[in-house]
UniProtKB/Swiss-Prot annotation:
It holds the Pfam family tRNA_SAD. Residues 1-61 form the TGS domain. It catalyses: tRNA(Thr) + L-threonine + ATP = L-threonyl-tRNA(Thr) + AMP + diphosphate + H(+). It is found in: Cytoplasm. HAMAP family: Thr_tRNA_synth. The keyword tRNA-binding applies. This is Threonine--tRNA ligase. Residues 242-533 are annotated as: Catalytic. Keywords: Aminoacyl-tRNA synthetase, ATP-binding, Cytoplasm, Ligase, Metal-binding, Nucleotide-binding, Protein biosynthesis, RNA-binding, tRNA-binding, Zinc. Homodimer. It comes from Polynucleobacter necessarius subsp. necessarius (strain STIR1). Binds 1 zinc ion per subunit.
């Protein structure tokens, strides 16, 4: 008798091996119809999977968290099926699941067009409506190579040939189309109801620029139409908020070919930068950090000692001078250890906290560069804490408190915490990593935090806590980190004198709150759609005169406000006031101060807040009070 145990603890007995679909049918016809797959003893499988021993089983339906992966994987195959139907000469390559959807790469003699996407989506809908069964077969590797060669699918044959000899491979067929895949897949194409093809792109075969350029089709798939509609709406909002477009519209920064991945900051953009930097400098001071500055270029020998040369060389810019090899720093930590090592330290001095607005350079692939979000040159609010093992928890707890206060001030209230654990490529032995990971777990527990663990995602020198911010349209951004490092201080000879006069190696905590200032400013721009809070706005108010008669008073108002430390401009052009109002509204200026004869005579200003909100006529002192309040509270005015 074969026993299948269900998630609620109930058991089903069967006299012979049984398919997942049959177990679902034994529970109820509704569940059988809804089944998309199963989880047998922790492994995701098709509904056709045969259970031949006592097992635990969970049926995957559209209510299961695993459902989207199966549906998206199956939709990628549906796309490939449609391509082969409409373009029989196209060759299929790979089609993985990615965040929010999938892509599939094809080789074809001409570029696909937007019209082709429309036709392909229509064909996919037609194939889905046929509700053709999706069947799995297993084939020896060599037989599978010949199978795909006969079909003219040379890329698939090459992929399978790279699998070790003697291994079997699984194939999935729907209608006339067969593809290589580990699975699992939906039981039939009729389960695929909500999908959309999104865009076209190029991609090299196997990611190697020496190989053929393939055509990549991106798509998205969802279990419910309302989920897809929400996702598409979010994409529309993302387009409106694109910091690259807003950076140009608001005259904040630009990029050019002569400096790929590097930013030309304009006065208004640099004003935002300065506000963020000065704010973070105050955080350094409040949290007991000493600000330092380390060199940009360091000898190769130091990078070899730190482990960067072995583990990070491909991302470093290198140069030579007088027969010595150097590298532009990709990280600030080795420089801070040198500052620490310049003197002898006692245990009484620990924790010792250094902070730097450290400019780093990383040789990112050109295809990965993306505005302010992915650059080759960036500045971090980078701090390093030298402490004892006993001080780790209290330092991490203090950092956690500070990081949340900072995010609150910048307008982010939803913060998720993740713990990134040891990667495959790392320095230090497992005992050191065990100690480091447990130290961070203990600190999170002591802080009362909930967290998600990310195996393999840590830095090469230590595990890290990551802070992920949710923005105003629901996207998440990883910004702050704190990492425990038992390895680098020892590699670079850092020591302190312990209470018993012995020499010990300090623990080093790497921490950043906003991370890359460039990226964080890009996030701020998109979060606020360019409507920066008053305290960050490059121009906090503009004085607009209605006619030449009030020009002198407009200048007087501007000067009075500037003397009080506000960022104020005036526009005295001989243009219609409606034209000037519209122009500065497009610039997303927080306040417009309109002055004419009446305002000049009464020493007042007519105030319009962002979004066309009329705040009426008020004495200048009253406007100053409003401005000071908004700045101190780090708020509005919000666009209507």
């Amino acid at each position: 008798m074969l026993v299948v145990t269900l998630p609620d603890g109930s058991k089903r007995e069967f006299e012979a091996p049984v398919r997942v679909a049959d177990v679902a049918q034994s529970i109820g016809s509704g569940l059988a119809k809804a089944a998309l797959g199963g989880i047998v003893d922790g492994k995701m499988v098709d509904t056709s999977f045969v259970i031949d021993k006592d097992s635990q089983l969970a049926i995957i339906t559209d209510k299961s968290p695993e459902a989207l992966e199966i549906v998206r994987h199956s939709t990628a195959h549906l796309l490939a099926y449609a391509v082969k139907e409409l373009f029989p000469e196209a060759q299929v390559t790979i089609g993985p699941v990615i965040e929010n959807g999938f892509y599939y790469d094809f080789s074809y003699h001409r570029p696909f067009t937007p019209d082709d996407l429309v036709a392909l989506e229509k064909k996919m809908t037609e194939l889905a409506k046929r509700d053709e069964p999706v069947t799995r077969t297993v084939m020896p590797r060599d037989e599978a190579v010949e199978f795909f060669k006969k079909q003219g699918e040379n890329y698939k044959a090459e992929l399978i040939a790279s699998i070790p000899q003697g291994e079997d491979v699984s194939l999935y067929a729907e209608g006339k189309f067969t593809d290589l895949c580990r699975g699992p897949h939906v039981p039939s194409t009729g389960k695929l109801k909500v999908f959309k093809l999104m865009k076209l792109a190029g991609a090299y075969w196997r990611g190697d620029s020496k190989n053929e350029m393939l055509q990549r089709i991106y798509g998205t798939t969802w279990l419910r139409k309302e989920d897809q509609d929400a996702y598409l709406h979010m994409l529309e909002e993302s387009e409106k908020r694109d910091h690259r477009r807003l950076g140009k519209q608001l005259d904040l920064f630009h990029f050019q070919e002569e400096a790929p991945g590097l930013i030309f900051w304009h006065p208004k953009g640099w004003s935002i930068w300065q506000e963020v930097e000065q704010y973070m400098r105050r955080v350094y001071q409040q949290e007991g950090y000493q600000e330092v500055k380390a060199p940009q270029i360091l000898d190769r020998g130091l990078w070899e000692k730190s482990g960067h040369w072995e583990n990070y060389k491909e991302n470093m810019f290198t140069t030579e001078s007088e027969n010595r090899a150097y590298a532009l720093k990709p990280m600030n930590c080795p420089g801070h250890v040198q500052i620490y090592n310049s003197g002898l330290h006692s245990y009484r001095e620990l924790p010792l906290r250094f902070g730097e607005f450290g400019q780093c350079h990383r040789n990112e692939p050109s295809g990965a560069l993306h505005g302010l979000m992915r650059v080759r040159g960036f500045t971090q609010d980078d701090g390093h804490i030298f402490c004892t093992e006993d001080q780790i928890q209290s330092e991490v707890a203090a950092f956690d408190k500070a990081v949340r206060a900072v995010y609150q001030d910048f307008g982010f209230t939803e913060v998720a915490v993740k713990l990134a654990l040891r990667p495959a490529k790392r320095v230090g032995d497992d005992a050191i990593w065990d100690k480091a990971e447990e130290a961070l777990r203990g600190a999170l527990k002591a802080s009362g935090q909930e967290w998600e663990e990310l195996p393999g995602e840590g830095a090469f020198y230590g595990p890290k806590i990551e802070y992920h911010l949710k923005d105003s349209i629901g996207r998440t951004w990883q910004c702050g980190t704190i990492q425990v490092d038992f390895s680098m201080p020892a590699r670079l000879g850092a020591e302190y004198v312990a209470e018993n006069n012995s020499r010990k190696t300090p623990v080093m905590l790497h921490r950043a709150i906003v991370g890359s200032l460039e990226r964080f400013i890009g996030i701020l721009i998109e979060n606020h759609t360019g409507n920066m809070p008053v305290w960050l706005a490059p121009t906090q108010a503009v004085v607009l005169n209605i006619s030449g008669n009030s020009a002198a008073y407009a200048q007087q108002v501007q000067q009075l406000l500037k003397k009080q430390g506000f960022r104020i401009e005036s526009d005295l052009r001989n243009e219609k006031i409606t034209y000037k109002i519209r122009e500065y509204a497009l610039q997303k200026t927080p306040f417009l101060l309109i002055v004419g004869d009446k305002e000049s005579e009464s020493n007042t200003v007519a105030v319009r807040a962002r979004g066309g909100v009329d705040l009426g006529v008020m004495p200048l002192d009253a406007f100053v009070a409003r401005l000071q309040q908004d700045i101190s509270q780090k708020v509005g005015p919000e666009p209507s």
